[in-house]
Amino acid sequence: MKALLDLFRQVQQEEQFDAIKIGLASPEKIRSWSFGEVKKPETINYRTFKPERDGLFCAKIFGPIKDYECLCGKYKRLKHRGVICEKCGVEVTLAKVRRERMGHIELAAPTAHIWFLKSLPSRLGMVLDMTLRDIERVLYFEAFVVVEPGMTPLKKSQIMSEDDYLAKCDEYGEGEFVALMGAEGIRELLRGIDIEKQIETIRAELQATGSEAKIKKFAKRLKVLEAFQRSGIKPDWMILEVLPVLPPELRPLVPLDGGRFATSDLNDLYRRVINRNNRLKRLLELKAPEIIVRNEKRMLQEAVDSLLDNGRRGKAMTGANKRPLKSLAEMIKGKGGRFRQNLLGKRVDYSGRSVIVVGPTLKLHQCGLPKLMALELFKPFIFHKLETMGIATTIKAAKKEVESQTPVVWDILEEVIREHPVMLNRAPTLHRLGIQAFEPVLIEGKAIQLHPLVCAAFNADFDGDQMAVHVPLSLEAQMEARTLMLASNNVLFPANGDPSIVPSQDVVLGLYYTTRDKINGRGEGMTFADISEVIRAYENKEVELASRVNVRITEYDLVNPEADGDARFAPKITLQATTVGRAILSEILPKGLPFSVLNKPLKKKEISRLINTAFRKCGLRETVIFADKLLQSGFRLATRAGISIAIDDMLVPPAKEKIISEAAAKVKEYDKQYMSGLVTDQERYNNVVDIWGAAGDQVGKAMMEQLQTEDVVDRHGKTVKQESFNSIYMMADSGARGSAAQIRQLAGMRGLMAKPDGSIIETPITANFREGLNVLQYFISTHGARKGLADTALKTANSGYLTRRLVDVTQDLVVVEDDCGTSNGVAMKALVEGGEVIEALRDRILGRVVVNDVVNPETQETAIEAGTLLDEDLVELIDSIGVDEVKVRTPLTCDTRYGLCAKCYGRDLGRGVLVNSGEAVGVIAAQSIGEPGTQLTMRTFHIGGAASRAAVASSVEAKATGTVRFTATMRYVTNAKGEQIVISRSGEALITDDHGRERERHKIPYGATLLVHDGQSIKAGTQLATWDPLTRPIISEYSGTIKFENVEEGVTVAKQMDEVTGLSTLVVIDAKRRTSASKGIRPQVKLLDSSGAEVKIPGTDHSVTIGFQVGALITVKDGQQVHVGEVLARIPTESQKTRDITGGLPRVAELFEARSPKDAAVLAEVTGTTSFGKDTKGKQRLVITDLDGNAHEFLIAKEKQVLVHDGQVVNKGEMIVEGPADPHDILRLKGVEELATYIVDEVQDVYRLQGVKINDKHIEVIVRQMLRRVQIVDVGDTKFIPGEQVERSELLDENDKVIAEGKRPATYENLLLGITKASLSTDSFISAASFQETTRVLTEAAIMGKVDDLRGLKENVIVGRLIPAGTGLAYHRARKAKEAADRDRAAAIAEEEAASIFETPAVQQEGDA
């Protein structure tokens, strides 16, 4: 009996653990794991198929092959459990121990572990302070290393070749010093390291040295040594003396039919190691010559290398078929490795997949499940039911019953399935709406039926898509599926909070057609008492669907929200001017929505807005019912409408011929000009492309105008225009299918096509699809079509990879508390670009929590208290009282250490309420950004030539009426004519309304003439400033007499004659074309005052010096009198090269990877005055002198455009050299908020271009993760190393600890890491290893003896626990609390026991202690 109980005890062993530690194994540890030494390379006997004794599959070492049966068969069955057979030495136990028992190989010579040698940076090299090359020479027996110099002048760890060694032996005599070859030598060196002492010396040297390179090197070495010291791992364990052998079941040998065997590559690799090891042992016993032994040792080292990581060094070992063998390292890394294949993505039971078809009769929370599939999926449930009902006595009988599919089985299936949700998933699962739960409805047939409204969320269509079904088994799982995942509970997109259950295509068309109005329809102007009357008239063909009529309509207003049911609403009857269709549709309107929401043509956007309004006003349940009704009506009405397309619907505009012939004439004109040499080929090409582009647009416009309207006679007999009922136009206008651009190809002209390389072919396709294309036109258009397909394939892969990196960097970010109590936040304004409001303030702050009280600017009363979550009504209020800037909480400034707080995150967009604790907001953010990735383009845009010329603006005008305000950065001077000339680089003009709310803002460039002044009231359309778009001026900020310096004709400047006017100007020559003597000098101007002294910059003793850059046209003469604001020189900007603008997906990836752009802008490091120093070869030297008089130098390439000139005052972070911004500079000079704003805006630009809406906070969450590491500047009294990068939370914890002890905390600066880098440098080595660069991550972690606290989601998935998010967060918290309570209780009990032994009260003991 006891044995039986023991047997059960074996099974349930649930280990609780809170962390996982990784380290290096000592030889003793490896021997302690082992169940015996593997001495022979044999595997199994080819005749008996039994494993060879002491071989790689030995039953004595690894355990029996059959359960409870020894190898020779002497002991069989359970009763002998634990007996070791005296004949064959096998323990009688379960065969599955062969999966967990390890063996070992005692190596005859130590070998180095290749990971610590070759995984860069080489850890062995770091510890020994030797180069990788030298260590390799020693290990592979090409050189000796001095281990013990003795009394000789040799140094420890000195490398010498064999000849050297022999020479030194002769010189100093044998045995005076010890030098070894191979891993023995390295092992001795490692054993000889005194870590404590080394650390002290390095720390001392770190203090002493000033060189950057040295500090870096020392810090790296210090980190490794300290890790060894902390973790208690000895460095010489990096050299293996014992090799562990994997349990045989994990490297199986399977007999195939025909007497052959399939084997794991590891067996081959182990065999080679054992063979070479045995040969080496024999050679050592035989005292073979040194050279032979050496060779054998080298081969052993190589064999061990390829077992651990084949192909890392030298050529990979290959098997019989010339294929490289798969080593231990390859088993765990990559997509097919252990991590990604088996731990993160497992195949699951209780699942099936089938094709999907549309199920228009289903309710939103249902799906149609084929009977056969359901029978298979719910089999165990049916067996159980059959047994409890007594229909079948055993499982076997139940199985038979089910397989014969008797009627009773179907009844039971119905019963089992009722209220048991199933989960449907469509690959690729790009966001959380890719898996939703439904209640199954049994259907005939073999295809799953899917509700049409969830197609948008799944991105599914019915052209052969397949979906998988999963059954949640446990009660908890069913409950979660029902409450959290049911389709009717997921009606909003988590990415932007818009409804996901929007109808599309037919439904939209049906609803649109129903709600359109028609002039002079049958029965126009009739008045009806109620809707039933309208329906009667319509069914008797007295009125048309689109006729304008008057109807009495009952609306329900929400009067008391507290009551339940219909008591909340009060009916209100009004006479409405509407159409028949809208009146009929109003029957389905939920109570609480006014009729006005339906009283307009319902296009797709309108329907989305309608569902959104319903959700906010009427709640989830009503919305779902309403959406279902809309769907039914839409389908019915679309069928009744009978809209179809005929060739006559494609109306070709009569003006087309004229437009095309005019364009062709213009092109001819340009060809002529080119022939006569007036324009270059490039210019001609640009203009031709321009002309055809414009012509295409004109044809398109003419076509749309014709399609849009039609002439009808109204009931007074007048001819009027009304919106057209053309089928194609209706489809496009309603948003059901097609777009203006596609209609243009049908009935306008196809226009310009691109070659595969992206350049535009200059001959357009003038035909459209209605007229048909000729062969050439067809051929030209195939390019584009094919490129589109290739692009899509690439895009999908790239987008998937971006999502993977994003998920990886944010996976451990979970909402863990309600409020972190921070008073930080970010000030939100409306997003204005080019004078237009792109995103209103209300949209940006919706669903955020305000930091400070929002004050009404007119009455100064508090309108909204701090800490309030802004919902739709509150943003309305903010809008109406005229607040234009609100400070809101953001994930960026959240003070929660490991995770986020709910207040900083704000509204959970997928649910419409404040986010719940445990929500995995990181993953949601990553999915929201990654999911639309496939819609982004892959191309980079060439902007240049004609296209960019048209876009050059030369003035800016106000779009709104209001008051002009200049920003603090705006500086200007007034010239002799009284004009105000701008001399700032980053000045902006704002226009505010009467409330002082910003309506628009415009950048005003340097050198512009201001036409308005600060505080002036203006009307819309007033010009604010003008400038010359083609040149950039250099303007004098002081007045005086010009004195040229280094302006010598033929040396630094050249005379240029203008052919047309005959005037001459001086042009500064490029340094490359100057004589060698004049290379370094720079043409410049000084100003003299009336007494002939140099004019000084006020407040300093610097002379005003204005330098001219290469290409500048000098417009003043020597000795000329100039006034403030006068132009001294002009720099033509026309020479701008066409530049590629990275767009689409690559741009998003570039931003999140925090890559520094090439030719990045240079920002001023300090606030101060600029001047130019002496130029070096090819570089200009720019000096900024700060307010304390310290000079900061910048070297800038000559061809770069410097935006500042001598004597200009710049602010820290201001751009001084043109170019794209570098995010690292922004962070360093302007801080976290500026950086976040930059990244958010740039990413949003890309998505906005594609019409994708993503909430800002998702991008902020990613940026938070990119900023989660900091770099230590001053260590204070902490354990860190200068220059070390650590997790922000770890640093803050350590600082808190140090401050509590009254010591000095460490100071740090923020670090911006790209998402890949950030994922790899997380504290969790499990998460990092499963992401990328597995070898490097594990090597580093093992040396550090790292502990993974299993904080993130990924680590927990890998070790197979519940994730600490959602319901799992509560579980883990409860578990930890229980453990703590248990510990306390155990301690208390122990104390009581101790007290009772001494018969003294416990209190007294404590007192004594």
Curated annotation (Swiss-Prot):
SUPFAM superfamilies for the chain: beta and beta-prime subunits of DNA dependent RNA-polymerase
Residues where Zn(2+) 1 binds: C70, C72, C85, C88
Identify the residues that bind Mg(2+): D461, D463, D465
Q: What class of enzyme is it?
A: transferase
The domain of life for this entry's organism is Bacteria
Asked whether the UniProt record includes Transferase among its keywords, one would answer yes
Annotated Zn(2+) 2 binding sites:
C820, C894, C901, C904
On cofactor binding, the record's note says: Binds 1 Mg(2+) ion per subunit. Binds 2 Zn(2+) ions per subunit.
BP GO terms, sorted: DNA-templated transcription
Q: Which InterPro entries match?
A: DNA-dir_RpoC_beta_prime (IPR045867), DNA-dir_RpoC_beta_prime_bact (IPR012754), RNA_pol_asu (IPR000722), RNA_pol_N (IPR006592), RNA_pol_Rpb1_1 (IPR007080), RNA_pol_Rpb1_3 (IPR007066), RNA_pol_Rpb1_3_sf (IPR042102), RNA_pol_Rpb1_4 (IPR007083)
* Residues that span the membrane, as ranges: none
Instruction: List, separated by semicolons, the cofactors it needs.
Output: Mg(2+); Zn(2+)
GO terms of molecular function:
DNA binding; DNA-directed RNA polymerase activity; magnesium ion binding; zinc ion binding
Q: Which reaction does it catalyse?
A: RNA(n) + a ribonucleoside 5'-triphosphate = RNA(n+1) + diphosphate
Q: Name one GO cellular component term.
A: DNA-directed RNA polymerase complex
Q: Which UniProt keywords apply?
A: DNA-directed RNA polymerase, Magnesium, Metal-binding, Nucleotidyltransferase, Transcription, Transferase, Zinc
The EC number of this protein is: 2.7.7.6
Tell me if Transferase is a UniProt keyword of this record: yes
Extract the HAMAP family matched here. RNApol_bact_RpoC
Q: Which family does it belong to?
A: Belongs to the RNA polymerase beta' chain family.
Briefly state the protein's biological role: DNA-dependent RNA polymerase catalyzes the transcription of DNA into RNA using the four ribonucleoside triphosphates as substrates.
Describe the protein's quaternary organization and the partners it interacts with. Answer: The RNAP catalytic core consists of 2 alpha, 1 beta, 1 beta' and 1 omega subunit. When a sigma factor is associated with the core the holoenzyme is formed, which can initiate transcription.
Q: What is this protein called?
A: DNA-directed RNA polymerase subunit beta'
Name the gene for this chain.
Answer: rpoC
